[in-house]
Amino acid sequence: MGRAFEYVILGGGVAAGYAALEFVRRNGGASSQELCIISDEHFAPYERPALSKGYLLPQDAPRLPAFHTCVGSKDELLTEEWYNEHGIVLVLGTRVISADVRQKTLLTSSGETISYKTLIVATGARAVKLEEFGVSGSDARNVCYLRNVEDADKLVGVMRSCPGGNAVVVGGGYIGMECAAALVTNNIKVTMVFPKKHCMGRLFTPKIAEFYESYYASRGVTFVKEAAVTSMQISAGKVTAVNLGNGRRLPADMVVVGVGARANTGLFDGQLVMENGGIKVNGRMQASDASVYAVGDVAAFPVKLFGGDVRRLEHVDCARRTARHAVAAMLEGTGSVGHIDYLPFFYSRVFSLSWQFYGDNAGEAVHFGDLAPPGDGDGAAPKFGAYWVRDGRVAGAFLEGGSRQEYEAVAAAVRRGAAVADVAELERRGLAFATQATGGGGKPTCAWHATVGVAAAVSIAAFACWYGWQAPYVLKRDF
C-alpha cells in the first residue's frame, strides 16, 4: 500500500505551514497528489512560540485553531480546511520510521510507503532529556518538557494541580526563562537550576544576564547557578524533590526541563551530509542530494552575514524564512532564486520586558543604556542594549525595551555592518549610533505579531497580547 506525490513536506511545525503558504502563492494551489505534509502530531502546523507564552496564561489562554500558521507573521490562518481547499494532503498523526533518499520513499509506522520527487525536511528538533545526562525520571507525571501542544497541555495540567506550590526549572535558556515567568504568573514558586554562571549563557553578556536575573529575583524567582541535577526523588510516580551535585535538595511539586534541543536528523544519517548537528544545505536550502531540501531547526545553512559560515539557528523567524526560500528555490528552478541572505534574529518577552537580538554575539561587547537592577532606578521601563564589534564593524546588536523604529534601526546597523571608528564613542552614543544613522528610524516597516481573519476566535489586539506577552515588535525585514 502506498501513495506518490510530486512534493512531500516531512514535519508539521512552523516551517511546514509557511512552506505550504509559499507553495500556494507561487503555484496557485496544489493539484491532486501534488503536495503532501506528513506530521506525527494530530494538528495542522501551528505557531509554536505561543506555547511558552500565551498558552500558559492563567486566564483567557488561547487554544487551537487560534494560532495555526501563519498568523504569527500577520498572515493567513491555515486551518485543516485551508489545506483541503488548496489541494494539500495532510497526513497527520503519522510517524515516519525510515527514509530512503536514493529510492525517494518514506515508510510510516502503519506500513505505508509514501514516495516523492522532491522532499522538504522540516522535522525540527526534539527536547534533550535528563536521561542523556544520566538522570532518570522524565516519565514522572509532574516532569514537563515543552516542544509541542501535547507537552504544553501536560504543563498546564501540572501547574493547575499545584497552585502555590514549588517548581524547579532545570535550565537557564529560552525555555527555562520563559517557563519560569509563566510559572510565576500562575502563582507558583520557582527555583531555577543551571550549570553556568549566568542565564542565557549562549547569548547574554554577564551584564545583561545580571539585569534579567535581578528582575526575575524581584518577582520571586530563586537562582541556583553553577549547579547540576544529579537525581530526582520520586514517590507514587511523581517527583517530590530534586537533588543537586552540590548536595542541596530542592522540594518540588513539579519540574520543568529546558536543557537544549537536538535536530531530528536520524532518518537521514548516512544518506545526507550533516554539519553542526543538522542537515547541511546550500544557500538554496538544498541538501547534498538535489531532491531534498531542509528548513528550520534541522537545517545547517551558510549565513552570508557571517562570511558564509554554516550555522544551525533554532528560532521561529529562521524556520519561517528558510521555508519560504526553499519553496521559492524548488519551484522557480536552478539559478532563478539566489542564495538566502538571512539576518539572524531572536526575541523574547516575559513579564513587562521585551528584547530583540540581531546578528552574531561575536567580538567585543559594548553596552549602553541603564542596566540598573529593578528597584535601583526611577521606576521607568528599562531600555538598554549592547553592540558586538568585530574587525571594526557592528556584528550584532541587542536591545531591551525598544520602539519599532529603534528595533529597525539596530537591525539595519547589523545588516550593513556599520563601521565603528571608536568603541568609546560608540558606548557614549549608544542607541543613537543606530537611530541617527537611519534618520531616527525612518518610517516603521514592522508589524505586531497579530492575525488577519481570525476575529471569530480572538481580536487582533488580544492575539498580539497572548502570542508574545503583549507581543514584541517584529520587523518585516526585506533588507
From Swiss-Prot:
Key words of the record: FAD, Flavoprotein, Membrane, NAD, NADP, Oxidoreductase, Peroxisome, Redox-active center, Transmembrane, Transmembrane helix
SUPFAM superfamilies linked:
FAD/NAD(P)-binding domain, FAD/NAD-linked reductases, dimerisation (C-terminal) domain
The subcellular location is:
Peroxisome membrane
The UniProt record gives the binding positions of NADP(+) as 174-178, 202, 260, 314-315, 347
Binding site residues for NAD(+): 172-178, 202, 260, 314-315, 347
Which stretches are transmembrane?
A: 4-24, 446-466
Gene3D superfamilies tied to this protein: 3.30.390.30, FAD/NAD(P)-binding domain
Note the topology in the membrane.
Multi-pass membrane protein
Q: Which residues lie on this side of the membrane: Cytoplasmic?
A: 1-3, 467-479
The cofactor(s) it depends on are: FAD
| Annotated Gene Ontology cellular component terms | cytoplasm; peroxisomal membrane
Residues the record lists as binding FAD: 12-15, 41, 48, 53, 147-148, 297, 316, 347
Q: Which family does it belong to?
A: Belongs to the FAD-dependent oxidoreductase family.
Function as written in the Swiss-Prot or TrEMBL entry: Catalyzes the conversion of monodehydroascorbate to ascorbate, oxidizing NADH in the process. Ascorbate is a major antioxidant against reactive oxygen species (ROS) and nitric oxide (NO).
What's this protein's name?
A: Monodehydroascorbate reductase 1, peroxisomal
Instruction: Write down the species.
Output: Oryza sativa subsp. japonica (Rice)
